[in-house]
Amino acid sequence: MLSRLFAVLVFFVAIPSSVFAMTTCGGEVACSVRGGDYHIELPSDGDLRGVYVFFHGYKSSAKLQMLQRRLVDMTLAHHLAYVAVDGIEGSWSFPNSPQSGRDEKAFIADVFQDLHNRYGFSPDKTVIGGFSIGASMAWYTACQQGERTRAMVTFSGVFWNPLPKAADCVAAIPPIIHFHGTAEQTFPLSGRAIGTRFRQGNAFESIAIMRSRGKCDVAIARKVTLDGIQCDDVPRCIRGDSVMCIHNGGHEARADMLDAALTAIGFPR
């Protein structure tokens, strides 16, 4: 009996602590990586086909984002896990952001790797998105490491000035669906100044950069309808279409928009 007990103890001592750490997050418990953390919720029926990695808006957090149940539940209905990544002091430290203090490219790369290690999410199963300044974080992620994502679905936020050049981004720009409102005042289509040193970018100029880098064929742009919104769809990019949906609303990220977008990029209900 003692020998068997000793063998069991040796077995557990021999297991690296990281193995136990891999099983201790989810739900109310944040998943920690170097530099920060994220929250995750999985579909309750076990039908898991991918993940939607979402960057929250200004003055929010991963924990608060998980309370946005319409977005979370819509994501789960499409058989995707919902991940809310935590910013720093309610914001994000991307290029030309008013916030600084963290290497977001490295941090987000660690989030992607952790999602792969814990849940097996590969780039072809990883969709990124965000709202407002969180959408900006998603745009810089697509620009800097788009090869690690399958697609991007964002709301009410793009690059900041000075805008990156097309050559600053990776060639593997993922397919994009972006929603932006004509009545938007927080992050207008043309952008706006934040204090005296910072300025949000122009949405049309931002997507033109992505289309240029992705070698999209703007000459054959067409109209498509998503959630009743007429969108500009530029096809034949290196990795898929680039879609801009301009609606008549304001600063919002609606679940019905997300529903249409996730279906369009290949994750139906």
Stretches found by the model and what they are:
Residues 182-240:
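Active-site-adjacent alpha-helix of alpha/beta-hydrolase-fold enzymes
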Residues 178-180:
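Short beta-strand/loop motif that positions the catalytic acidic residue
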